[in-house]
């Protein structure tokens, strides 16, 4: 005997003799639904068309999708399924497909790069009568060029297209290159974050029992696990919510002032509104961010990967007070030197840089404020 609790189209069985499990599930259901919708909004996806499953990483999500598609084809026909993969896919895709091929569960075709991207025509030419899935990432793992996911999906004519789109999201290009049928993401909500597998509901048909173990009404994410995932998401630091909060504070401040100035002015130079009366000539624009990594790691990565000129890293309560950032955000601060006029595009660029670095920096914790480093 079991009662069914729905969560965004996914179901879980709850034994009636475990009321504490039901309470935990109800506590986590609404907040987790909010995170699901937040992710779909980030992707530009219609919430009514997609299922979302939280995973440990994009690697797990990719493996779920590939193995389920192969097994579904084997259940439908005796013909060995065929999988199309790109030449620059992440190892979680290529190794999974090759392992299934060694077990004689599938065959596969690797699409070579043309001008550092996957040509939709080459994908069309590779289609066979037994093709069950194509795996083409939003960006190539080696050279980071964009693939035309919608064009590739059009030539597949109903064959599901699965895409790893983490780089597209963290580079701010997902709206220009939206996923087609299913997608995976890595390290959402901070460097201790979660992975995501998103699928259109029409692609989900018959895949549910294979991905969730016992079908949509059994073996899917259990109720205590829903609440645990919710607690995990809200405890991540830094989180998307936190970064967006700081971003909004800067937008509000920069509507009144062209620059956020480096500290070093005497108190006589600072009027009641916390900013200098006269703008010093030639003073470049700066943006301040609270980040979850040590200053030394960020300095090298930003300078080498993005060619952004770094000013200096400080920890100054006076500066935070001037621009009215709440005390709970007083952590290691990063000043990134930009152009003479700090525009919204500059802010957007820095947002993308820091969110991307969030996904590639090893796990760690913030140093105490007194240990913040500075450099010229």
Curated annotation (Swiss-Prot):
Pyridoxal 5'-phosphate binds at residues 58-59, 184-186. Induction: Expressed in the late phase of the viral replicative cycle. Pfam families: Aminotran_5. InterPro entries: Aminotrans_V_dom, PyrdxlP-dep_Trfase, PyrdxlP-dep_Trfase_major, PyrdxlP-dep_Trfase_small. Keywords: Virion. Its cofactor is pyridoxal 5'-phosphate. SUPFAM superfamilies: PLP-dependent transferases. The keyword Transport does not apply. Belongs to the class-V pyridoxal-phosphate-dependent aminotransferase family. NifS/IscS subfamily. This is NifS-like protein.
